[in-house]
Amino acid sequence: MAADGYLPDWLEDTLSEGIRQWWKLKPGPPPPKPAERHKDDSRGLVLPGYKYLGPFNGLDKGEPVNAADAAALEHDKAYDRQLDSGDNPYLKYNHADAEFQERLKEDTSFGGNLGRAVFQAKKRVLEPLGLVEEPVKTAPGKKRPVEHSPVEPDSSSGTGKAGQQPARKRLNFGQTGDADSVPDPQPLGQPPAAPSGLGTNTMATGSGAPMADNNEGADGVGNSSGNWHCDSTWMGDRVITTSTRTWALPTYNNHLYKQISSQSGASNDNHYFGYSTPWGYFDFNRFHCHFSPRDWQRLINNNWGFRPKRLNFKLFNIQVKEVTQNDGTTTIANNLTSTVQVFTDSEYQLPYVLGSAHQGCLPPFPADVFMVPQYGYLTLNNGSQAVGRSSFYCLEYFPSQMLRTGNNFTFSYTFEDVPFHSSYAHSQSLDRLMNPLIDQYLYYLSRTNTPSGTTTQSGLQFSQAGASDIRDQSRNWLPGPCYRQQRVSKTSADNNNSEYSWTGATKYHLNGRDSLVNPGPAMASHKDDEEKFFPQSGVLIFGKQGSEKTNVDIEKVMITDEEEIRTTNPVATEQYGSVSTNLQRGNRQAATADVNTQGVLPGMVWQDRDVYLQGPIWAKIPHTDGHFHPSPLMGGFGLKHPPPQILIKNTPVPANPSTTFSAAKFASFITQYSTGQVSVEIEWELQKENSKRWNPEIQYTSNYNKSVNVDFTVDTNGVYSEPRPIGTRYLTRNLLLAAA
């Protein structure tokens, strides 16, 4: 403690230095101190786990680790430019700070929250001192003036609100894009604030933006409520894919629920019973809904694995259309007072149909417009009839958002932790893991009789196994399970000319019904040098663009090939092995038989089925007491709590009711459909390849043969096509490489 009337030495030194600097101060902003400049080789005060999130760090530390780190790098560059111009950004809240906060407004990570908080505090501290740039400097320049929002539809009369409404910003997906574009009020990953009276978790499972002047995403008829984004952002060990498509929703079943069942005369194996509903649902459970062919190429040629982490969903630019007929002329007009209803089944109360390889997903080509599929489901049946345990669901029993033209709907979801998909092939075989130069110290039974002159005598002999008898060596691991399939050739002359598509197929029996084992457990498609063969029901078969539904030729389908897993998995069309079937003795020789099915044994190791650009991303694991290695047999990630179903329907509007009362159910409605855009953003975690292999890898490429056509493009009629399936296993790893 300093004596009365005296200042402490440290405070005196600080004040003296400040007075000296003030005495020499020149007009204009103070010059930056040398220590304030970014140095390319400096670490600075960077948050652990980041490269740029923190002050005084260098600008050349490699790729940012995530979106917050990328925003920090852009912020550092902006500071560097200000320092070069003689401005000192550290002593005022400036446009770079505002843009940094804008980029992080969707980021809920620790680093993102901390970055926003620091610069919000900086702004609050400097505001009373007049050291905050004017808003005109803070906002990015616009390519055109932002018009005032036109009138919005009123809830009762259909007329607009009186007077000019404040201009609204547009959707910001959190991507680093055109600095001149108009920012959006409703980020894809940021649900709007909950209306008063609702809990804070009300919007966590999906929300509709209300018609209001509070920048919650609701826009009038004249303004779009979101922007189109189709791209991918690569950030070190992450990639964010964003897809936007245009959808159309008809009115299904004339707003009715209906029973559906198998037709009379159907075989017992084909009987079913269920319900169709007037609702549709959004299905984006295919990889090509999110990855372009080029992005898929980048993904599989540079990574050993990937898995989904987060998902953001948004419906926007919703338009309800009314169709009228007058003297043979069809008129389509906006209906500003009609609504659509949307909700997410976050509790999985409804039968879950996503992941069953249905049509109706977002199309792979962004320019194509798709129809929202109708929601229907099956329940327990006896033949074509219901039983006591059969369930029926009324979807109007669920709370839903009612949205009009100009509204939007958002939903955010976090994937459960799942293993990385193994996007690599093995460069070793499970039965060839040994050193061929060294014999084993273990022995094996090499002979059971001993030659003696011209006869043989019973006698046991043992040997150590080496390279010359590698088949006899002791091994730690067994190949995976087997459920044998019939072999089919792509060359018709190699096949029997009888009809065996059902009678010769591998099937399982459940509740008195047979079903194909299709595709069944992951097994290799064929042996070496037998590419023309494939298992009858053991592979995924995709249709080419324009293929008919039934009995199409082989040239119109795409047959996948799981040949890369034959290093660990049995070949589907071969026996698993052989097994002893008797007890040998003096007068009885040892006998064996083929093993065509083999369940799981201790010591088994195997690979799951590969995933394909055209294939599913996930499947819901059934809710049962027991399950074993629930990896979906069609490929993808097995999830106990997958992205919930998002359901939508056009709200019925009665058409010209009678002026006299009738107790009958109303069955006449105006003809309506709805349309708009849907955007889905998914963040994927990547497992970068870091092989020490010397010789070049096999990688996916489009120049696999000489062609005069461009793959994955449109034809002269504007029809987009995918000419072949693309899996993920081109890079290699050895079998015993440690997991990352």
Task: Provide a role label for each language-model segment.
Residues 2-154, 170, 177-178:
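Extended terminal accessory/targeting regions
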Residues 139-740:
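Capsid-like jelly-roll
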